[in-house]
């Protein structure tokens, strides 16, 4: 279970990602969370990625139309892809096991 400190960090992630927090004097404030607390609670890993310029520009355009930054959009895209691929792999594994059991039982 998350600590109260972690829950506070989680509830504001979307606001930070969309630049609603931290980008103006009105919304900016000093956090009492340490960098370690923040990184531990949201379990993010920084990566370096090379991508075609035109694809990046398209991602930025799409993200802007959704009112978010391109990096949160890329995270959403990757998450959707990973979830869909995991579902596909699990379905294939279930089908394989069904066929294996059918052959084992019926010869």
Swiss-Prot record:
<dbReference type="Pfam" id="PF12441">
    <property type="entry name" value="CopG_antitoxin"/>
</dbReference>
<protein>
    <recommendedName>
        <fullName>Uncharacterized protein PM1122</fullName>
    </recommendedName>
</protein>
<dbReference type="InterPro" id="IPR022148">
    <property type="entry name" value="CopG_antitoxin"/>
</dbReference>
